[in-house]
Amino acid sequence: MKRRKYFGTDGIRGKVGSMPITPDFILKLGWAAGKVLSRFSGGRSNYIIIGKDTRISGYMLESALESGLAAAGLSAALTGPMPTPAIAYLTRTFRAEAGIVISASHNPFYDNGIKFFSIKGTKLDNEVEHSIEIELEKCLTCVDPKELGKASRIVDAAGRYIEFCKGTFPAHLSLRKLKIIVDCANGATYHIAPSVFRELGANVTTIACRPNGVNINKECGTTDIRQLRAHVLAKKADLGIAYDGDGDRVIMVDHFGNKVDGDQMLYIIAREKLHCKQLTGGIVGTLMSNMGLVLALKQLNIPFIRSNVGDRCVLAMLKKQGWNIGGENSGHIVLLDKTTTGDGIIVALQVLSAMVNNCVSLHELCNDVSLLPQILVNVYCSSIKSPLESDLVRKETKAVEQELSEQGRVLLRQSGTEPYIRIMVEGNCCYGKILYLANRIASVIRSEIKSIQ
């Protein structure tokens, strides 16, 4: 298939005001997507659900999308700020033509993006995204005035989704004795996640739940848990839960302030499913998954397979294997027996149910999975030519791998959503040495970037 021009690993993303995140391009994207999605779904409902996170640019892009869809003859049903997985859920329950989310996930406020869901609440196939890109090359033509789309609002979207989330928590259990700190990253979960946990009985304290359009992910959320850790310790809470800007990722903190990442949550959920005789097959991780997770699952005789990085790759591998549970150490976890895409609230509820069901703390649930020291270093790279093709980078990478021997590994990759080279080094040695080795590779990559710019 031809290389895609606009779509990355998670929709279309970029800096607001620069191509492709401009009002004129997004309007045409709405038109092109409307034409293509109608074709693929057979025009069953004639409307598309649009949700967004809390970025100030969301209003502008929402209006542009709405106009483009109307020109293609499709109506827009607006939800306002809602988590990405909520749009996936609403799209399939409303039998909408498709769902669109305006969000750049964990990125800063000045970035934004567009991602699509099919009528089934799943990410679009490559074929559909390719067809949208072909349509974008055509001239925009408006339907007859009588066939123009309209806009409406789904007023009970939040309530519907809250009830859906609560329904994934065992009916015989309660969160009544738990004290939880919830960090909503000033993002799309701010009016959802606290309500879910409170309605299930938890004593909830919120932080980063006052979005103003420009504070999304700022010193909070899954990418910065310092504030959450401090509140958990100060309030003597049982645990803390952090979301990213659009709510498809979750990171937790135990009562000692220790970070609990996606790998540890995958282990907790898998073990609980195994004990309850509800585990289908094994677990799908990614190239970034910690060796500690692999070894812990092996102790339970649970199969483990790695996919490429990204929830799309995890989902593809789950489908291929016929399994239900997979995810990334970033906290993006997919539970296909519960929903169709990564959902931070639902994942947190499954971890909480394991705590309550076994009458143990989050810290105790993590006792049997010992993660190896792992470092992720990001190097900014806007160059079209990749420095990863350099002989010097390859030579340094090989030298580091030899130093780690069979006790570790190195992974270099270009991010699919941001202009960064990701350098992951993992090994069965002290943290300081892992950091030193990662920075050695980063230094060579930075030198190569300078030489090719």
Swiss-Prot record:
Binds 1 Mg(2+) ion per subunit. Mg(2+) binds at S105, D244, D246, D248. The modification Phosphoserine is found at S105. Keywords: Isomerase, Magnesium, Metal-binding, Phosphoprotein. It comes from the Bacteria. GO terms for molecular function: magnesium ion binding; phosphoglucosamine mutase activity; phosphomannomutase activity. One of its GO terms (cellular component) is cytosol. This is Phosphoglucosamine mutase.
